[in-house]
Amino acid sequence: MLLAIDCGNTNTVFSIWDGEKFLCTLRTSTHHARTADAYFTWYSTLIKHYGIETDITDVIISSTVPRVVFNLRVFADRFFGCRPLVVGKPDCLLPVQPRVDAGTAVGPDRLVNAAAAYDRHGGNKIVVDFGTATTFDVVDDDGAYVGGVIAPGVNLSLEALHMAAAALPHVDIAKPQAVIGTNTVACMQSGVFWGYVGLVKEICARIKGERDRDMQVIATGGLAALFQQSEILFDIFEDDLTMHGLTVIHRHNKENGTV
């Protein structure tokens, strides 16, 4: 069985796979100081609660938070007796190497999304991931990651408004009833929601124009569904894209004898 771990700035997600069969997902908030023992206590408690029988033999990790990788490595080694693959490290092979400026460090989550998009849908794609940051990743015809765009995330933008302007409250993102808000909360929600609709449309249009071709747009991430239900912005919606990408990269390494 494979344990795939996606550690982002906000949440850490564990996904368990038996071959190609998905079994379950466990989610917790990301804490920089969480120990290997604490990970195991949380993990084993939930596995027991849900009545899931597991026999983990392999672990793969993608983390945008470098500080947590060490303890996740210890967790995998101590409790499952395996050396985990860590996306972005030299010993973790990618199906296709990224084509970006020499010396550029590409976020592992972006490499994982590119691998998943190509495996499921082929090349010539734009992947929009609504996470702590909103990222746009361009996947070439052969599956290579060739660059993209990083914009502030939706919730990050709302939080910045609240933190920087004393009179503005903390609000949650939602589709407003109208563009013109009649109270402060509605005005903030309208600005962020419709602002991001415009941002996605404009950036995707400019990427297509720069590459001089039409491209399918794939959406993933926690808030993608909100925008997909409200506006026709995407051709494909994949809520499990990143986790699928981790299984793709693990399979590639398995086939090449690195695990």
From Swiss-Prot:
K(+) binds at residue 129. Its cofactor is NH4(+); K(+). A monovalent cation. Ammonium or potassium. Substrate binds at residues 107-110, 184. It catalyses: (R)-pantothenate + ATP = (R)-4'-phosphopantothenate + ADP + H(+). It comes from the Bacteria. ATP binds at residues 6-13, 132. The active site is at residue 109. Its main location: cytoplasm. Its EC number is 2.7.1.33. Keywords: ATP-binding, Coenzyme A biosynthesis, Cytoplasm, Kinase, Metal-binding, Nucleotide-binding, Potassium, Transferase. Gene3D superfamilies: 3.30.420.40. Pathway: Cofactor biosynthesis; coenzyme A biosynthesis; CoA from (R)-pantothenate: step 1/5. One of its GO terms (biological process) is coenzyme A biosynthetic process. It is an enzyme of class 2 (transferase). It is found in: Cytoplasm. Homodimer. Belongs to the type III pantothenate kinase family. Catalyzes the phosphorylation of pantothenate (Pan), the first step in CoA biosynthesis. This is Type III pantothenate kinase.
